[in-house]
Amino acid sequence: MKKYLVGGAVRDSLLNLPITEKDWVITGSSAQEMLSIGYEQVGKDFPVFLHPKSHEEYALARTERKLGSGYTGFICHTEPSITIEEDLYRRDLTINAMAYDMNGNLLDPYNGQKDIQLRLLRHVSNAFYEDPLRVLRVARFAAKLKNIGFTIAIETFEIMTHMIHELKSLSPERVWMETKKALITDNPQVYFQVLKKCGALKILFPELDILFTIPQCTTHHSNLMNLGNQTMTRLSNISCLSNDLAIRYAILCCNLGSEMNPRKQPLKQLTQKKPQISIINNLCNRLKVPNNILKLTKIVFMYYHDLYDVTKLSSEMIMTIFQAFDCWRTPTRIELIIKINQSQLLGSKFHINYLFFQSTLLRTAFNETTQIKANDIINSGFSGINISQELYSRRLHVLKHWKNKFLTHKQ
């Protein structure tokens, strides 16, 4: 029996990146032997075992043979005679097809170390064709490693463009899993840009793909030209401001359904936005996006464009936004609102000082309204539904008074 550290841990160690998890491959052993020495089997499709103490995953070396379509049409073969080189051959990218033996020696049969030096994402073999999920994985690695200069090898990208016909065979869970991982990278927009370029976006995310055909109606980012590019820019912006998966996904969806409003008329009411909300619902249901993310996405969508220039908002609208985001019960939500505002202003025609001005307006406006407490209303003799009505009325009065002074002072 021989043990090898494989996959992302090897790649990240060579890139001097943090190692978040370790995966191991065992050669010269069998499932029966692994069980007999205390490992717990967890893999259904192929033998994967948990170490009895570290609980790290150990897989028996295996080869794969494609029999059907999609990513599930594989027959896995394990036996003690399979070598580590054979196991690494089935992997997607050369940078993921390296291993360390237990003496710390690097095994690199497919030149992964060279591609690390070249900063290239290159497929290991033509077996890459056999798994359509690899299109998403390569796009995700392009997003993950963008900051350190990685790009996709030309020949690998060409293969990806010829694989898109099999993408429909992917389960929603697998698509969401890769997308979720991509969204929490430093450059999530790269994931969608790669999918767009290779033709996968129109198959997996047609709601996003159509945005690249819709001209942008504002001159604030005149170089972006269309709503698809605008969405990518704002996704990049929010990623500089927040690591939160839910808010990044919400910003990704901020322009969905724009093709249903060709005249670009302001849509203020929920009834006017129902067709667009239904597109968000359909996308999230198809991908099986968690309900908490769906809920936030719809709230952000409702008020996203209002938050472009908060100096133009009425006090009533500011109160409505605070209520929609449940700020008084969850005060940290005000920072979320500010980040949504900033994600639209970064890189625009506005000076950076104006960005901070809007942030100050939102933050201070909220703080002013929090000075009015429910207990103050109760102590004034109000009860029942009258409490919330009076609380709203007083907060609105305070906000109007403060906002007038604030804007007058800044002029």
UniProtKB/Swiss-Prot annotation:
User: What are the protein's GO molecular function terms?
Assistant: ATP binding; CCA tRNA nucleotidyltransferase activity; magnesium ion binding; tRNA binding
Q: Does the keyword Metal-binding apply?
A: yes
Q: Which UniProt keywords apply?
A: ATP-binding, Magnesium, Metal-binding, Nucleotide-binding, Nucleotidyltransferase, RNA repair, RNA-binding, Transferase, tRNA processing
Highest taxon listed in the record's lineage: Bacteria
Cofactor(s) of this protein: Mg(2+)
Q: Does the keyword Transmembrane apply?
A: no
Query: Residue limits of the HD domain?
Result: 227-328
Q: Which residues bind CTP?
A: G8, R11, R91, R137, R140
Q: Which family does it belong to?
A: Belongs to the tRNA nucleotidyltransferase/poly(A) polymerase family. Bacterial CCA-adding enzyme type 2 subfamily.
Protein name listed in UniProt: CCA-adding enzyme
